[in-house]
Design a protein with these regions (language model features):
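Small/flexible residues
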Residues: 4-6, 21, 62-65, 76
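Short, intrinsically disordered low-complexity segments
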Residues: 1-3, 10, 59-62, 71-73
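A generic structural signal for ordered secondary structure
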Residues: 8, 14-16, 77-79, 115-117
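Residue-level signal for pocket-adjacent positions within structured domains
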Residues: 21-23, 28, 59, 81, ...
C-alpha cells in the first residue's frame, strides 16, 4: 500500500479539488511520497508541482486508511495565498468546491472532510 500526502486547502468556505486527466471523479490534491519523504513534504511538493501553489503554513492533521483504497492518506491542512493554475499534464482541471454541489468525487474526499467538521 502506498503512502499518499493529501492536501486540504480551504478558501472562502470552499475546498480545492482536482481531477486527473481521463478520470471522472474529483479528489483532494496530493500524491505519493518519494523514498523517505515525509508525507507533509509530499503534499506540499505535489501542490506546487501540479498547481503552482506554495504553502504559507502546513499542519499534518491525521492519517486515514479507507477500505478498498490503494493508498494510506496522510492528510495535511495547507494555507496558501497563491491562486491555483494547471502546471501538470496529469491534471485535467481543478475547482473550488462549496461542499454542497453534487459533483462526482472519490469517497475519500467526503470521509476526510467529515473528520475536519
Amino acid at each position: 500500500m502506498r503512502i499518499r500526502g493529501t492536501s486540504v486547502v480551504f478558501r472562502d468556505g470552499k475546498v480545492l479539488l482536482v481531477r486527473d486527466r481521463g478520470k471522472l471523479k474529483f479528489s483532494l490534491p496530493g500524491g505519493g511520497t518519494h523514498h523517505h519523504e515525509p508525507s507533509m513534504a509530499a503534499a506540499i511538493r505535489e501542490l506546487h508541482e501540479e498547481l503552482g501553489m506554495r504553502a504559507r503554513k502546513a499542519e499534518r492533521i491525521f492519517r486515514c486508511d479507507f477500505e478498498g483504497s490503494q493508498s494510506k492518506h496522510k492528510v495535511s491542512l495547507i494555507e496558501t495565498d497563491d491562486e491555483p493554475r494547471l502546471r501538470d499534464k496529469e491534471l485535467e482541471e481543478f475547482i473550488w468546491w462549496d461542499m454542497k454541489a453534487d459533483i462526482p468525487r472519490f469517497s475519500h474526499v467526503d470521509q476526510i472532510l467529515e473528520k475536519l467538521t
